[in-house]
Amino acid sequence: MQSSLRIFSGILALSLSGSLYALPECPSGPSEKWHNCFGTFSIDGDKYFGEYKEGKQHGQGTYTRADGEKYVGEFKEDKMHGQGTYTRADGEKYVGEWKEDKMHGQGTYTRADGGKYVGEFNENKMHGQGTYTFADGKKYFGELKEGKNHGQGTYTFADGRKYVGEWKEGLYHGQGTYSFADGRVFRGHYMNNQYVPSICQDMGLTKGTEAFGQCVLKLIDEITKDN
């Protein structure tokens, strides 16, 4: 029985190592000459273990930085490229697609405080369609541009409040509906996070007057041109 277990363990170890790297081990000598093999390279406390092609990190590999940060995944010509996982020293983690050392494509970024973004990235920034769930319970689902809520989106607060509508550079801007937990609803146009009728009232104009109506129409026109 013990003999059978030893044989099984040996087969398992061989199959695992074979599944990790199908290429042969790189020969001794400068890494610039390594080709179609896997090897280990260290410099200034950083360490790479993985596949090489024409002297460059290319294929599957693991790169561990001296500060403890680590990338495990695909490489292309010495750059993180393809599917991979990057774990920061503070615990933050990105799992998803990479392009030339940048988060690019579909991915999931988890912050150290528990906040999480799942969606599209463009050159290291949240960009496209995505969902961001905050550690305190708030949630945004919709379009983003260069890391900010931009376009159509829904923002839900932990206390039940909700905004559904247009955004611009992280602010309510355009057509939208703001619902309160007590049932009140402000539906209409927003400008830089403010409800348009409220802006006119703050200017001292009385709701229902001609001046108030002109103020509202003017701001809506500005918003329309701005978008």
Residue ranges of each PLM-predicted region?
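Bacterial N-terminal signal peptides
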Residues: 9-17
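Bacterial N-terminal signal peptides that target proteins for export
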Residues: 1-9
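Glycine/tyrosine- and acidic-biased, solvent-exposed loop/turn segments at the edges of beta-strands
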Residues: 20-227
